[in-house]
Amino acid sequence: MVKLRLKRCGRKQQAVYRIVAIDVRSRREGRDLRKVGFYDPIKNQTCLNVPAILYFLEKGAQPTRTVYDILRKAEFFKEKERTLS
C-alpha cells in the first residue's frame, strides 16, 4: 500500500518537509516512489504537484493525517471536485 506522507529535510531546528509517495513498510527517510510536494512550516509555504497527487490518490494512496490537513489547507480537495464535475 502506498501513502502520501512527510519526509524530513533541512537542518537542525529548521525542518523542511517533502511530501512523498512511499510504501507503508518503508521508514520515514526511506526510498520514496515520487516526490509530490514541499512544505515549509517556518515560512508557511506549500508547493504541490497536483497531477502527481491526483494520480496517486486515484491509484488508492492514503494521505497521512498531517498531509491531509496540508492538502485541505491548500484547498486541494475543492480543486479536485471542480476537475471531477
UniProtKB/Swiss-Prot annotation:
Transmembrane segments: none annotated. The lineage of its organism: Eukaryota, Viridiplantae, Streptophyta, Embryophyta, Tracheophyta. NCBIfam families: S16. GO terms for biological process: mitochondrial translation. PROSITE patterns: RIBOSOMAL_S16. GO terms for cellular component: chloroplast; mitochondrion; small ribosomal subunit. Pfam families: Ribosomal_S16. GO terms for molecular function: structural constituent of ribosome. Belongs to the bacterial ribosomal protein bS16 family. It is found in: Plastid, Chloroplast. It comes from the Eukaryota. HAMAP family: Ribosomal_bS16 (MF_00385). This is Small ribosomal subunit protein bS16c. Keywords: Chloroplast, Plastid, Ribonucleoprotein, Ribosomal protein.
